[in-house]
Amino acid sequence: VNIPEFKVRVFKEDEPIHETRVIVGKTHTQTPIFTDEMEEIVFRPNWYVPNSIKQNEIAPYLRRGGGFFSSGWDTSVLRRQGLRIRGANGRDIDPDRIDWSRNDIRRYELYQPPGPRNVLGLVKFRFPNTHDVYLHDTTQKNLFSNPVRAFSHGCVRVQNPDKLATVLLGHDQDWSAARVSSAMHNGADANKVFIKNRIPVYLTYFTAVADENGELKQYKDLYGHDRRMIAALNGRPIPAGLPDNVTASSGGGERRVSRRSRRGDNPFAGIFDF
C-alpha cells in the first residue's frame, strides 16, 4: 500500500500482478507506516469496535440525558446500525439495561455482525499488528471516485476486494474467482481462511514514484511526513501530527468545520467510515 498514492499493489517475483484503489486514514486518524505478514482472510467478518471509538465517539452520545433508564439515551442508534453489546459472560446485553452514566463502555464488547450494514463489508485481510490496522471491503463504494481518498479511522479500504482475495488465495491455495465470490456472498459468517505461506505486507509512504515507463509520479504529502523531515534536516522541526496544509504557527487561517455541520445531525455518522 502506498498511502499518498491511494493504491495497493500485489507483486510476484518483483513484478506487479494486481493493483486497485484504496481509502486510507484521515489526517487526524492516520494509517501507520509499518511492515507485517498477512496471516488470514476473513469472509463475512464481524466488526469489533475499537476502544478508541467506543470511548471517544459512542460513549459521549449514550451518556446524554443522565439517569438510569433515561429516555435521553438514544440507544436506538445502536440498533439502527446493527451494533450489539456483549458482556463479560459472552452474552448479548440490552443497551437500555446499562447505566451509561456510571459504566465504562470499554468493559463491554461492541460488535457489528455480518450483514449489509457491516462497515468491513464482505471480507477483511488480516496481518495482526499493534495498530489494529488491516485491509477490508467497505459499504461506501462511492468514495473511491474521489481523487483524495483519506476518509478512514486508519484501516485501508479496498475498492475491489474480491479480486484482491482471488489473487492472494489463488496463489496460496488455488482458489478461483467463483469460490471467492461464493465465500463472500453465500458462505458462512466469520469464515477464516488461513494463509499457508504468509504474505509480506508493506504500508508505505512514497510521495515520488517511478512508474513502469520510468516516468516520475509525484503525490501530495498527505500527512506532512516529508515536510517535517525536510524541516528537521534544515534545523527547524515541526510538531508531529500536523497535516501538509497546516503550519506550526499560531497565526491561524485554517478553517475548522465541526463534524455535526459536515455530516448533518447524525452524531454517529463519523463512526461508520472505519
Predicted segments, located by residue:
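Well-ordered beta-sheet/strand-loop patches within structured domains
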Residues: 1-274
